[in-house]
Amino acid sequence: MIELKFEDKVKVWRNLREELETNPHPFDLITRFMSTLPVSSRKSNAFDPSAQIQPWHLLENSSFTEYEIAQLYAYTLQLTDRFCSSKVEIHISKDIEKEELLYLVFLDGSIVLGYNNKATSIDKLPKTIVSQKVIVMPPLH
């Protein structure tokens, strides 16, 4: 997606959202897609409210911080009819065992996206993962 023109990126993103509407395994589909995005070496301060970027501006990027990927997960789900009424949160979390910062997307308090580039249920998340800040995503439509 990085080498595409902006208009083509919008089409790819729209096609993903359309496929999420009917796919029997939507969380596998979205995590596979997100795992193909290039991760930037840039750092963003996810604790700063101004670090949240609107969806269309995210698409302008050629690479993404881990926080931007979490935002893209959230926006993608919110802009589908299937998940538009779901509660979407970004959890800025820390694996206290590995001293690693994580940006996880929680859907309806039960599904976690982005942990090890997979979808998992909240009860299967290791107990060493501790949320440090929760960003509740406002509905988009």
Protein language model features and the residues they cover:
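A structural boundary/capping signal
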Residues: M1-H141
